[in-house]
Swiss-Prot record:
Keywords: ATP-binding, Cell inner membrane, Cell membrane, Lipid transport, Membrane, Nucleotide-binding, Translocase, Transmembrane, Transmembrane helix, Transport
Enzyme type, top EC level: translocase
InterPro entries (UniProt xref): AAA+_ATPase, ABC1_TM_dom, ABC1_TM_sf, ABC_transporter-like_ATP-bd, ABC_transporter-like_CS, ABC_transpr_lipidA, P-loop_NTPase, Type_1_exporter
Ranges where the ABC transmembrane type-1 domain occurs: 26-309
Name under which the protein is recorded: ATP-dependent lipid A-core flippase
Family note: Belongs to the ABC transporter superfamily. Lipid exporter (TC 3.A.1.106) family.
Any one GO cellular component localisation term in the record: plasma membrane
Source species: Dechloromonas aromatica (strain RCB)
Length: 585
């Protein structure tokens, strides 16, 4: 996993994303190199000026040379520094965009179990926040590291040429600086991981408060949510201060060792000057180069914190990119299925649960037949619906479509033959037309979309809207009523025209008028399709070809509505209870 990768391995992997932009990357490095290598030219000019300029300047051009040379140096630094920064930023922003795309592409292909086991807020935080951390390491931090490192190398080369003895004294403090940086790097990386987890919790609390704002208001949960949010941001603040403490402590220590080296050097240089072992120009040039060395050295040590944050973020990013996608080892293509669905001794247990949600359940849905699953909460109805499209893998038994075992069928081929309409309608912040013609049907014609909407009894309210099919419906269809949202979901399923249909309590949350429209749309949708209905309101499935009653994951009884009432078992008891409740209301 990515948490086991070293810093070098993480950087090398990041560089694989840089490969498509290698020309711009090399150009950025070249520009930074020119800008950085202009650094030692300034102290070199200072040496020449002090040793030769004042005493040997006779002609008019001698007086202009040094001012023009200094202006030229800083002009070169400015131009090439700008080009280097811009090109490196262009490369890094493209890399970040590709990383986000890679994360999103992997996310939409993750197995359903991953979403059950991981907080959605943390997943959102990884794509939004963690990639930004990589951007910080890839832009500002990386730019500073490259540019300042080249400046340090250039100045050290000049110092070695000028006085190698003094330079060796300078380098003697490097091991101490390296130890400080190494110790603090581990600390900063650890804290950065904690900050990422903390940001995920903040995002989760925000998401729940926003999505559940009506519940928060009705039940007076404002203070409770404020406390939850305060706890999450307090943890983030605590971790931020730990990171600041490590970063702030590192910089003075590095500067102390560097200043100690400078102090020793100045003492030795003064002794050499007193014995005529060095010139004034050489001494001033050496001290100037030493002082110029301090700024890039400080920036290089300061950049350690964002680099460690970036590496911790890269670990998080690659851990998502490396997650295994849904297993899809099937080779068989269904084409358009006839619609024969068979559950044969199916057993499934949710992770962390001791009792199977389904235990040795067998059932058959013949082509064009409507089979309803009923039972109390927790009986396994929705689990059966989730297993047919292979949202989860079975523990035991087998599910077949047209005689083909699910693991042998290509995942896309299987799901192309299944449409789903559930109680929890999912709509996207797009137009009505785009929500009907979603996914594989996005190239549907206007006539096909209108025909699907008409069959779903949705065209009447759509045409009443000023912009019709082009109406934006807001997040999850917030601008529409429950019945309207449900009919759009049915229109989407009608347009898909899949031979197998799953209805998961599709009318349980609707009022009577909305249910009448939706039930009419469902009747249109179910015609000629193999339909598996998960029902809570038993009155909606009286016309089903067969009804299967489940309890505690076991099949209790099977038959038509009339047969099960005559049997006077579980279904009959549930039916009488609901009828009594309806009369009481």
């Amino acid at each position: 996993m990515s948490h086991d990768m070293t810093s070098r391995e993480l950087y090398l992997r990041l560089l694989t994303y840089v490969r498509p932009y290698w020309k711009a990357f090399l150009a950025a490095l070249a520009c930074m190199g020119v800008a950085s290598l202009a650094e030692p030219v300034f102290p070199a000019i200072m040496k020449s000026l002090l040793d030769d300029g004042f005493s040997k300047a006779n002609g008019p051009w001698d007086w202009l040379f040094y001012p023009l040379a200094i202006m030229g140096i800083f002009l070169v630094r400015a131009i090439f520094g700008f080009l280097g920064d811009y090109l490196m930023s262009w490369v890094s922003n493209n890399v970040v965009a590709e990383l986000r795309q890679a994360m999103f592409a992997r996310m939409v292909r993750l197995p359903t179990r991953y979403y059950s086991d991981n907080l959605s807020g943390r997943l959102m935080s990884r794509i939004a926040y963690d990639v930004t951390g990589v951007a910080g390491a890839a832009t500002n931090a990386l730019t500073s590291l490259i540019k300042d490192s080249l400046s340090i190398v250039g100045l050290l080369v000049w110092l070695l040429w000028l006085n190698w003895q003094l330079t060796l004294i300078t380098l003697s403090v490097v091991p101490f600086i390296a130890i400080v940086v190494r110790v603090f790097s581990k600390r900063l990386r650890s804290v950065a991981r904690g900050q990422q987890e903390s940001m995920g919790k903040i995002t989760q609390v925000l998401q729940e408060a926003i999505e559940g704002h009506k519940v928060v208001k009705i039940f007076g949960g404002q203070s409770y949510e404020e406390d939850r949010f305060y706890e999450s941001i307090r943890e983030q603040r605590r971790l931020a201060m730990r990171a600041t403490l490590a970063s702030a402590a590192q910089s003075p220590l590095v500067q102390f060792f560097a200043a100690s080296g400078v102090a020793i050097i100045m003492g030795v240089a003064l002794k050499q000057a007193s014995s005529d072992q060095t010139t004034v120009g050489s001494f001033v040039s050496f001290v100037t180069a030493m002082l110029m060395l301090m700024a890039p050295l400080k920036r290089v040590t300061d950049v350690n914190a964002p680099i460690q944050r970036g590496l911790a973020a890269a670990e998080s990013v690659f851990s998502l990119v490396d997650e295994e996608t849904e297993p899809d080892s099937g080779k068989e293509e269904l084409g358009r299925a006839q619609g024969l669905v068979e559950f044969d001794g199916v057993t499934f247990t949710y992770p962390g649960s001791e009792r199977p949600a389904l235990d040795s359940v067998s059932l058959t849905v013949r082509p064009g037949e409507c089979v309803a699953l009923v039972g109390p909460s927790g009986s396994g109805k929705t689990t059966a619906a989730n297993l047919l499209p292979r949202f989860y893998a079975l523990d035991a038994g087998e599910i077949r479509v047209d005689g083909h075992a699910l693991p042998n069928i290509r995942l896309n081929s299987l799901r192309d033959n299944i449409a789903l309409v559930s109680q929890d309608v999912v709509l996207f912040n797009d137009t009505i037309g785009a929500n009907i013609a979603y996914g594989g049907k996005r190239d549907a014609t206007l006539d096909e979309i209108r025909a699907a909407a008409k069959a779903a009894h949705a065209l009447e309210f759509i045409d009443a809207l000023p912009e019709g099919l082009n109406t934006m419906i807001g997040e999850n269809g917030v601008k529409l009523s429950g019945g309207q949202r449900q009919r759009l979901a049915i229109a989407r399923a009608i347009l898909k025209d899949a031979p197998i249909l799953i209805l998961d309590e599709a009318t349980s949350a609707l009022d009577t008028e909305s249910e009448r429209h939706v039930q009419a749309a469902l009747d249109e949708l179910m015609r000629g399709r193999s339909t598996l209905v998960i029902a809570h309101r038993l009155s909606t499935i009286e016309r089903a070809d067969r009804i299967i009653a489940l309890a505690h994951g076991h099949k209790q009884e099977e038959g038509s509505h009339a047969e099960l009432l005559a049997h006077d078992g579980l279904y009959a008891r549930l039916y009488r209870m609901q009828k009594a409740e309806e009369v009481a209301v």
